[in-house]
Amino acid sequence: RFKKIRRLGALPGFTSKRPRSGSDLKNQLRSGKKSQYRIRLEEKQKLRFHYGLTERQLLKYVHIAGKAKGSTGQILLQLLEMRLDNILFRLGMASTIPGARQLVNHRHILVNDRIVDIPSYRCKPRDIITTKNKQRSKALIQNYIASSPHHEELPNHLTIDPFQYKGLVNQIIDNKWIGLKIN
């Protein structure tokens, strides 16, 4: 995990740790001129590790984005940002995307009052994301929300009610709110 962060830079969804500033300078001095292949590979790896995708899943999303009208890169990022695990992370209900995946896999999350246990579930506008009415589920989410430092900077396509453990997807994400810097 730390090797990946040192190599690719800060990945907020992957872990809350940040690379030290001195290691960035060493990497740049050591690496020399980057080839086009290396730049594209690093950007692809950033996407994979940040969103927790396998190679096959990423290829599937690229294929869907290629068929849609508009910029393939922007549509790809919109598809990835509208995944359930990522929306839980953005709402502050989980500290990292892998943590959000675990919440979904362990059936703590309801979408429109139905249990969803698939982290890659594609959320749509007007979806209501809540926790189960069990005490354990509410305690887990409450701990994450209380310890969440980025609660103020909630993207404008999401709203959260921390007292009812409820989040709402208002619209498809706007490009300026995508948290990952991709070249």
From Swiss-Prot:
Designated name of the protein: Small ribosomal subunit protein uS4c
Family named by the database record: Belongs to the universal ribosomal protein uS4 family.
Gene3D superfamilies given in the database record: Ribosomal Protein S4 Delta 41, Chain A, domain 1, RNA-binding S4 domain
UniProt function note: One of the primary rRNA binding proteins, it binds directly to 16S rRNA where it nucleates assembly of the body of the 30S subunit.
Domain (S4 RNA-binding): residue spans on this chain: 82-143
PROSITE patterns (alphabetical): RIBOSOMAL_S4 (PS00632), S4 (PS50889)
Subcellular locations according to the entry: Plastid, Chloroplast
Subunit comment: Part of the 30S ribosomal subunit. Contacts protein S5. The interaction surface between S4 and S5 is involved in control of translational fidelity.
